[in-house]
Structures are given as structure tokens and as C-alpha cells.
Amino acid sequence: LQMESFDVIVVGAGIAGLTAARELLKKEPTLKVLVLEGKDRVGGRTLTVDVQTANHTSDKFDMGGQWVGRTQKELLALLDELKIELYDQYETGRKMAQLGTEKIRSYSASLPVFAAGSFTLYEVIDFVRNIFRMNRMSNKINVLDAFSWEGAVAADEQSVASFARSIALTRSARDALDIGMRAVYGAEAKRMSLLYHLLYCKSGGSFMDLIEATGDGAQAFRIKGGSQQISLKLAEALGSDRVRLRSGVKRVETSEGGPTRVTLENGDRLECKRLVLAIPPNQCGQVEFSPPLGYLKRRLYDNMTPGHLIKFVVTYKSAFWREDGKSGEIISAGRTTIPGEILPIVCSYDATTSNGSPAIVGFIHAELHDWTLNERCNAVVKDLVRFFGTKALAEFIAYEEKNWNKEPFNGGCPVDYVTPGNMDAFGTIRDMHYGVHFAGTETALVWMGYMSGAVESGKRAANEVLHALELREKVDHKYLKGSQFSVDYHHPHPPSDHYNDTISPWRRRIFFGCALVFGIYAVSKKYDLSYTARVFRPVEKSVFKWWTGSEWPH
């Protein structure tokens, strides 16, 4: 049988893959482009579902990526093109926190960092000191070349948790950082490379920008109707003939200058001039490559671990927390005085829709993965009662959750992260493998790990393909930054562990120190001085001579 042939095949019908296909056809409509998706839906790590709400109706809620930040320019531009509207994340009122103790504390500042009224001055100073130190370190990172920073090797050798323990003076500050890691990455701080975290912060602006819902924070806006409609609209514009669902890729055969052949899980074989893999790094590791990937890229995919967040939505008869003067925001360490006990909620936000359907959205600790759905539901509602009072149970309507760890062709959410000691491999994440290009939010330079990063990565991959197909007049070179086709591309520095043969200054210090002590001793013996005078008389003589120009009187 003759193999189906295409100019470009894109694997992955999430935001990155569909953006790549759209960009290619926008620049060159004559290209024969096909998008393959292993799941039975488009959207990747975005998923919008209907949940029962007040007044016996239902409304749409996001169970995957959902927030948009003011500085996420690529995503904002795409939303504008697709005529998708935004609305503000509600954050008015007191926020609830359980940090450093079982006691629940409330605060009105954007973050507990600035909540001097609810936390001790010592805790606030510790919060601020740690945040500013982390921001100062992340500002030194070059996103394109992490190991150009002199502190990179040491940062990659330690986890975020070990770093936090070395600088944080209070349990509250350590808890706050742990919660930030769980909410942003779906991972424990002890499992993540500090260097990766610093690079991720730099990509999004700062650590504060990753965790805030105000200002330039990543949680500033939500999408009317849900975020999955981005992919649905992109796929609709491409046409059903260009998007094939239930078409997981098993094997890729590629070569320099020759065609690339793709074998699907059902045995079908396709051929293309260029292939774009727009799937998470951990899923790239499930694909068999011929010839094999290089050592560093193979190690990258083996050691990039997906986050393990469980996301929940609880709908209510009314937004009672607003009536009580609360914003709906919770941050919780989930720890108690009982060894081994853990409470489910990591953080939560007001999830009331643009239609006015009251709800709370949040994330659950990974330790609850093996619990049943009913056990997690009961635990979450009980925990909401702990923060919001008995109305959290009395006005309960429905509970919905998404365990992304069980999602096929995904393996976790919201993002893949790098474990300590593997950031040298991360430098290859955008590198091509013969006729194969790589997209996905983890490959982005700006807002890595977010929907905006997915858009950017799709455009980069599309422009790489146009360049490779000799359609260079159609290439937008600003999207080739970080690509091997960039005019100013240079391979990232490898981690340096070389010997430093400079002479230690301590040799000179010890020599001159000994000479000084011997001189003082010799003078004191000659003039038979007291112990105090033996120390100070030579100094007095020197100062006297320098000041007066005369010798010390005998």
C-alpha cells in the first residue's frame, strides 16, 4: 500500500500543536498539513466540562489550564484573534492561610508576604527576605543559557526544598514556598532542581508573578466559556480533514535530508517532509526514534517529570464567602500536629463564572491520588468548612475533579519539571532531531509552562519548519529566538566543573600574618614591653612617624 504523504505532520492537538498548524497554513496555504492526536478530543492540558450549578442548571468550568496574565502577550493576541473574551479573577476580600501552624489566619494583602497584621513581624520579614532573594537569583538567569550564570552548577545540584531550608528562618516561610511549588508545578519542592525553578521564574517575570492574581500575576483573568474553546476554535478553522483523533504515535523514523516516517499505534504509517512533536516532554520519551535521540535529549525526556495535581471544582447555591467578606482564596500546608495526617487543599480561588454560577476551584495534594472519588470529595468539603464555615457544606451542590495523572497521552499536569542534576540536558529541549521539531509550553522562552508559552512554542516550531522547507521569505525571525535556525544562535554553555589553578590568597595572608606577629614579638622583646604594649607600641610608632615625620622618642 502507498504511504500517505504530507508536507508537515504535527503531533498533538493542544494549543501548541494547533497553533503551529495554523501558523503554517496562514503563511503558506498550499502546504499539506495534518495534525495527529492520541486522545479522543482536542485541547491537550485544557479541558472544559459542564458541572451542575445553582437553580438546577449547569455551567462550564475549566479542569485544566484556565488563567491568563496581563503580560502573556502571545495568548492575549490569540484570544483577540479568536474573539474570546476575558473577565477578572475575583480577589476582593480577606484571604485564608494555614502556614507554620494549625491555626487559620486571614489577611487582606495580595500575598501573606505583606500581611503584617496576621503574621508576626519576624515571619513577614522572613517572607519578604526569601522572596527578594529568589527574585534576585532568578534575574541572573539567561533563559537561553542557564549555565552562563556562575552559580548555576550549585543551583542545579540542590532541590528547591534544600535551598528553602538553608535560607528560611520560619516554618511559615518554608510552608509558603512548598505551597507555591505545589500550585505552580504540581510537584514537591524536594524533587525539583533549584536552577529549573529560577529559570521558570525568569521566564514568567518573577516568582511573585507566578503566584499572584493581581498586577502582572499569572492568575489575573479567566476565559469566558472556558479555555478549551481555544483549541476547539483552532481545530474548527483547520477543518476536520486536517485533524485526526485517536491517532497516537508509536515510532518516528527520520534522516538528514530525507523524509520522516511516522508509525501510529494502530499500525498505520504516514510520511512527511517535516514533523513537529507538540506533546509534553514525558510523552516524547514514550516515542521510539530511529536513529535514536542524542544522549542529553534522551536523558532530558527520562528525567522531566509531570506534575501530579488533582484539580477540583465545588459549586454552591450562593457565593456565601463573598457575603462574609472573603475572596475565596486559600493557601494551606495541609499539615497538622498528628504525624502523617494531611488535609487535602493546597490552594483555592473563587471560580464563580461569568454567568454568575457560584463555585470554588482548587488543587489537591498528590498524596490523595489513591483515595476514591467520594473520599476526596468528602475531605475537600470538610476542609472548605474549616476555612469558610458550615455554609461550605449547607450550600453544597456538586463536586467535580480531574486527576491528570490518569489522563492518557498526558501523564500529569500542569507542567513537566526537571529533577536536580539534569539541567544540562534541558539545554537541548528545543534542538531538532534531523527532520523533527519540538514544541510545547515547556520549550517556550516566555511564560514557559503556561498557555501563552504554548502559543509561542507553536509559532517557533512553525517558523523553523518554514525555514527548513526553504520558504524563508515567509519566516518571522523574531520567533526563531532560541532556535538552531536563529542568526545569533549559540549552543548553551555546559555545566563547568573545571579545576581552578589560581593561587589561593590564603597563602599570602598566612605569610604576612606570621611576619606581622613575629615583628611585634621581636620589638616587644627588645624594649621589654608589657603584653598590651607589645601589641600596640609598634602601631603607635608607625602612626607617630607617619603623622609627624619624626622618629619615636627613646
Model regions: which residues?
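N-terminal Rossmann-like FAD-binding beta1-loop-alpha1 element of flavoenzymes
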Residues: E4-V35
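Active-site rim elements
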Residues: S58-V68, L144-A154, D216-K224, K297-T305, ...
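Conserved flavin/dinucleotide-binding core of flavoenzymes
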Residues: T19, K27, P259, H308, ...
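Glycine-rich FAD pyrophosphate-binding loop
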Residues: L25-A54
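Active-site/ligand-binding neighborhood in enzyme catalytic cores
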Residues: N139-G248, S255-T260, A278, Q283, ...
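Dinucleotide-binding Rossmann-like beta1-alpha1 core, especially the glycine-rich loop
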Residues: H56-N139, W149-E150
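Central helical "cap/lid" subdomain
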Residues: S247-G248, E253-G328
